[in-house]
Amino acid sequence: DTRYSFSDPWRLARVMDAVPALKVIAAHFGGWSMWKTGWQYLAGRPNLWVDCSSSLYALRPQEAANLIHRYGVKQVFFGSDYPMWDPVQELEQLKALPLTQDEQESILHRNFEAFLLGLG
């Protein structure tokens, strides 16, 4: 689907390869509806974080949890994609995932706090 070609994860991977020190936050698990391609191109990069906004409704809970673990829990931020989506629903979808309480707390705030403080 060419509508999403500008958010194709390989484009971001090329930028990150060209500028290795660049810190990047990629929305929608690195590429909306291209989640497998996203983690194939982007997972394992220590200077990349993804958010889970506007994605959890379209993934089965175990698929979403698998994506989170592929990127690494500490590399994932909670995002609501407000005003497009209801933050309460996005939060409920995150809390319904098969994740530990500690993993959820990391995604909800700890990871972003560390990122803002330069610790992430």
PLM features: what roles do these ranges have?
Residues G72-F77, M84-G120:
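Mid-to-C-terminal alpha-helical segments outside catalytic/metal-binding sites
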Residues D1-F77:
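Catalytic pocket-lining loop regions of alpha/beta-barrel enzymes
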